[in-house]
Design a protein with these regions (language model features):
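Hydrophobic alpha-helical connector segments
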Residues: 1-23
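Amphipathic alpha-helical interaction segments
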Residues: 7, 29, 37-39
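Solvent-exposed, charged/polar functional surfaces in cytosolic regulatory/catalytic domains
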Residues: 12, 16, 48, 52, ...
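Short linear capping/connector segments at secondary-structure termini
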Residues: 25-32
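Amphipathic alpha-helical packing segments from all-alpha helical-bundle domains
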Residues: 33-55, 63-70, 74
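Hydrophobic/aromatic-rich alpha-helical bundle segments in the mid-to-C-terminal region
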Residues: 55-120
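Long, charge-rich low-complexity segments
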Residues: 108-147
């Protein structure tokens, strides 16, 4: 399941991190003058996870996937910093609950899309939102596929 791959990616990211360094970095990024850099770091992690998992979205989904994963990842990091359970088991359970909540929200969005009233309400905003595209990166950078 895709949700298991996302959980595994977040877990792998946290397991290679030094908890004390992350704690200190979180403290630094909580200061107003560094908050934008902290948000950029979380967004970058979410982007790398989605890219590693093969995300090919080019529309609004590109942004919503990364925003949602940023929220899940950020909250999981904060939980992980305070977790003293053996093997961080409480953190992994917390992560599973967050992903389950995202899945419930996605199901709700799907049911709204299928509902005639939901379709009617989203017709106008949908026309505007379908114009949003993922950013285009230069294809001549190292590590980027050509094409």
């Amino acid at each position: 399941r895709f949700r298991d791959r996302i959980a595994a990616a977040i877990r792998a990211r946290l397991e290679v991190a030094d908890q004390e360094l992350v704690r200190r970095g979180t403290t630094l990024f909580s200061l107003p003058m560094h908050a934008a850099d902290g948000a950029k770091a979380i967004w970058g992690t979410a982007d790398r996870i989605w890219t590693a998992l093969g995300d090919t979205s080019q529309d609004l989904n590109w942004y919503t996937k990364r925003a949602t994963l940023s929220a899940v990842y950020g909250s999981t990091v904060l939980y992980w910093l305070g977790d003293n359970s053996p093997g961080h088991q409480a953190t992994w359970e917390f992560l599973d609950r967050r992903i389950e909540q995202v899945m419930q929200f996605e199901k709700l969005k799907g049911s709204l899309r299928e509902n005639p009233l939901g379709k009617a309400l989203m017709a106008g905003p949908g026309k505007v939102l379908e114009r949003i595209r993922a950013p285009k990166l230069p294809d001549d950078l190292p590590g980027r596929p050509f094409g």
